[in-house]
UniProtKB/Swiss-Prot annotation:
Organism: Mus musculus
Protein name in the entry: Hamartin
Entry keyword Ligase: no
MF annotations from Gene Ontology: ATPase inhibitor activity; Hsp70 protein binding; Hsp90 protein binding; protein folding chaperone
Biased composition (Pro residues): 393-402
Amino acid sequence: MAQLANIGELLSMLDSSTLGVRDDVTAIFKESLNSERGPMLVNTLVDYYLETNSQPVLHILTTLQEPHDKHLLDKINEYVGKAATRLSILSLLGHVVRLQPSWKHKLSQAPLLPSLLKCLKMDTDVVVLTTGVLVLITMLPMIPQSGKQHLLDFFDIFGRLSSWCLKKPGHVTEVYLVHLHASVYALFHRLYGMYPCNFVSFLRSHYSMKENVETFEEVVKPMMEHVRIHPELVTGSKDHELDPRRWKTLETHDVVIECAKISLDPTEASYEDGYSVSHQLSACFPYRSADVTTSPYVDTQNSYGGSTSTPSSSSRLMLFSPPGQLPQSLSSPSTRLLPEPLQASLWSPSAVCGMTTPPTSPGNVPADLSHPYSKAFGTTAGGKGTPSGTPATSPPPAPPCPQDDCVHGSAAQASATAPRKEERADSSRPYLHRQSNDRGLEDPPGSKGSVTLRNLPDFLGDLASEEDSIEKDKEEAAISKELSEITTAEADPVVPRGGFDSPFYRDSLSGSQRKTHSAASGTQGSSVNPEPLHSSLDKHGPDTPKQAFTPIDPPSGSADVSPAGDRDRQTSLETSILTPSPCKIPPQRGVSFGSGQLPPYDHLFEVALPKTACHFVSKKTEELLKKVKGNPEEDCVPSTSPMEVLDRLIEQGAGAHSKELSRLSLPSKSVDWTHFGGSPPSDELRTLRDQLLLLHNQLLYERFKRQQHALRNRRLLRKVIRAAALEEHNAAMKDQLKLQEKDIQMWKVSLQKEQARYSQLQEQRDTMVTQLHSQIRQLQHDREEFYNQSQELQTKLEDCRNMIAELRVELKKANNKVCHTELLLSQVSQKLSNSESVQQQMEFLNRQLLVLGEVNELYLEQLQSKHPDTTKEVEMMKTAYRKELEKNRSHLLQQNQRLDASQRRVLELESLLAKKDHLLLEQKKYLEDVKSQASGQLLAAESRYEAQRKITRVLELEILDLYGRLEKDGRLRKLEEDRAEAAEAAEERLDCCSDGCTDSLVGHNEEASGHNGETRTSRPGGTRASCGGRVTGGSSSSSSELSTPEKPPSQRFSSRWEPALGEPSSSIPTTVGSLPSSKSFLGMKARELFRNKSESQCDEDSVTMSSSSLSETLKTELGKDSGTENKTSLSLDAPHPSSPNSDNVGQLHIMDYNETHPEHS
């Protein structure tokens, strides 16, 4: 709390009127900021500034260095989010960024930038918006790389504020809308200068929508008319603009100058673009009258620089008159010219301007540049600025400049003419007023004595009225035609949007309106509390035409004729020459803001727009102020413009004309001949006409020289502008160099301090190092001792481990001994029960021993009495008894231990026997499981075998049928010869079947057709064998040669029936006569099939399981088949089931049908 109270006292002392106290407190704060790293002090300063607006606190905050920049930005970001403090904190931010701190590059990464953009997107307070936009414009050149992240936000803000300028809410003061419009133009200028490709793309996409077209036409298009085509639009791209490498080589002022180069506005463009500031240097001259009717800015049709002129320029002319007096054209319309003495030699404006002989022929001058200043000042070449008596040889009136041409006029011409529009006459000369375009329609002819510039055409017209009526009518017709051309272009004014006059629009009021506003301006200037400029601007807003955007001109002080006013004006010009304001409000404008102070964003206009021109203005102003203080009469003459020289020329001509009239020998000089209807003498008229013609020729010559000098000046002005820009750049670089030198000095001082501090720290480090080295050595010594001790302990530990290992071994042995001892104890306990008798005997013996001991004692006493020494003998006997007793005990222990060990061995063997029995049971169970599994697998294999056998049997039957058909077809030609043999064979088969088989024969009749189409008789084709019979073949048929189709049928039949004749007791299968022979492959296969068929029928009744494995069955298949054939050779009368061996069927063998198989014979 004490510290907070101390900070409060110091803050109150900051606003002290004593400069020393203030400096001391500021130094204390800076030292505190350098020493303290926390945010508390910065937050306190920000809060105090927001409460009091203290300038010393502002100075401290704007000079903060790292690391307090983060604290300041965080605090500003916090207050930006609050509506109550948003305006004040944005003003503070503007002051901070305006000074371009060293940590300005951190602004792009700080959270303050998104908060500022959000505020500009959502806030509705026009003052806050204006301040925020100006702050953003100031920050953009410092953080150009932020465009890659926030470029769309910048464009959205521009689109929102441009439409805001068009909507113009009624609750907002119009002056603030004017300021907002100025800030939007500055934002347009900055975005177009930095990101032209992206910005033009945004404008194309955003304003191509129907709802934004009006905003484009009213706001954005006039802005675009005042910028050049950016080179990046041709050579660059969107990605290149956002590339950070583009901005690495550019400083902040480089970015600002690059943006300024693309402007066409003479008051906004950079100095090298032909900007002339002579109108700002006119503070050393007494200002002309501010009558709007004499202003060259008001004519939009004939004004050469009308496209870049603003109503603020005419408004400034209105305010150039002192507040306490009316404009001269209104207050003293009949003031007469003060005649000057006629010089001995012919007076020439070129001599007054200090010009030499003009350059060569103007043959190359374009037609539109022949009379630039006459266009710029609303005069024509035909003599609107000359007497009305100009002969017809004068050049014809130049056509008025169209509005489009004026808008798109050359920047060089605009810069060469527009700045000269406000130049003032010499302080020693009276006020002169250039002629207005519509003066001839409004002002009646004045008296001859009124020789002001405005009354000069009437005066000259009175002089020329004595000419003949034809010439007078011609002149009046020419004047009327010229005036009609001027007034026709101004006849249809368009009321601007919003009903107020902003400085971004052109003014083309009619003459009566200008007079009204001029009078109003003079009336306001004469009041006690004069109203500010914008109040007079607001009054004539409804009468102004549709306006075009133009930038803000730097301010100019109000006119004051008195010397005190001159001093005040010079002082104000010196102090505020670089403080532009949107409306160029003079110091009295503070009344409009209520508090008597400038708006909070006024200081930001200096950095929002290019300031090269402002620096040039300040430099030239200082030079001219010095010249005015030294010799204003002589020094200011060369600075006069050609138009002022032309005014002086007309003044000189009027004076010469009056002197010539005074020299004439007229009867009465006061007689007005034209008034009385007469005519003056011819010689006087001729003299006057000659002199007037001479004067007109001189004016034409001077105009020609002025044009040539203007061309030359424009060429030189470009060089001067570039030189001044380079000087300004050098000055900026020098300032930057000075700042860097200051920084270098500061860093050198800090380096020295740091070096001293480093030396102290080095000494402290050395002492600490020595101490640490000694400590390290001590610790190393201790470590070595501890290491030795640890080694000793390690060896001891190893010994202890070895001892423990030995002890464990001994423990195991001891445990074994204990086990044995326990066994022995158990045995001993058993034996002790058996040794009770031995104990009784021992007790008895002990009793006897006691008795004998007593007897022995008696004997000993007797011996002692007899003195014999028997102690040795007794001791030896005792030791002998003891040893024997110990021996017996040890023997007993051994016996007990052996008994225990044998018992334990018996127990172990019994346990092993039980385990083995258990294993045998498990193996038996496993064998039973294996047997059951094998039997299951065997049954599955047999079932598969049976199924495969049936399938094979069916296939073989089909194959045999096919082979039989083939053989039958081959034997058709010999079938007739074999009928007899076939019939006999059939009878024999029938006889055999009736004797040995109880089954009926199934005959198979075959019908065969011969080659001649005859039908053959059918023969039985097969038999069904008995259940126990099996068809077998003899060994002779198995060993016989292969049957071939070439064999005769008789041989085949004889060989086929040989086994049947040789074995009468065996069952003979019933065959068909058409079957193949027994020696052929088909015959063998047929026999095997019949045998297998009968075997399968018998197997269905007697199927048993075989104990052998499937593999053994398959190996012994052939032998079992032969055995089965021998067993089945039974009589058909007594069939019986086959043996169990008949269940084993041989493996199926598929062979070539053309070969014989001896195993299946």
